[in-house]
Amino acid sequence: MGTGPKYKRILLKISGEALAGEQKTGLDFGVIGQVCDVIKTCTELGVQVGVVIGGGNFWRGVKNGEGRMARSRADHMGMLATVMNCLAVSDVMEQKGIPVRVQTAVEMSTFAEHYTWERAVAHLEEGKVVLFGAGSGCPYFSTDTAAVLRAAEIGADAILLAKNIDGVYSADPHVDPSAVKYDAITYDEVLAKHLAVMDLTATSLAMENDIPVVVFALADPQNIVRAVMGEPVGTVVTK
């Protein structure tokens, strides 16, 4: 392995819950600051970074709607939650001197740029971090699917999936103590074994576009740098 980063352009997916830290809801600016510091390290290594952030720390469309409101409207609220997170993260990045742009799938020009892949790529090539808000802009599609979509559009070398678990397991390790962690696995195996990496739509899209996914725990934000460098961390999912 060389001394430089393994991946030159990445799409980092961070759940909204991760930004809430121990409090589970809202924003933990200590956690956000740590994540921003690590992203800054990546950019200083010459890595171009796009980020999709979930919104579950404020609102989860399907779960919070509980069938008492239209699914599309509940998902629209989830999209707005992701934009709130993007604005918070971008503010912390600006305080730290990190060049950043927020782009949203739904036009809201007062807050952010409207997403186009051409403009996103131009920002990345100029060394800016691009935060993608509002998911894919369509209800019924998860932010994991939005992350894979954006990764494909910007030509990312890999998707870094920062979760609350340190990789892909044969079963839920919180339920089954005999669950085995995979260091590497194929998309076909993930689909055949119904493993909880991403939802089916996101997994299929990543496989179709041959984009590797690195699944790791965000509990130690330095795992982001380790993943970028190609060091053993979490689970690598490939075609």
Language model regions located:
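C-terminal catalytic "cap/lid" subdomain
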Residues: M1-K239
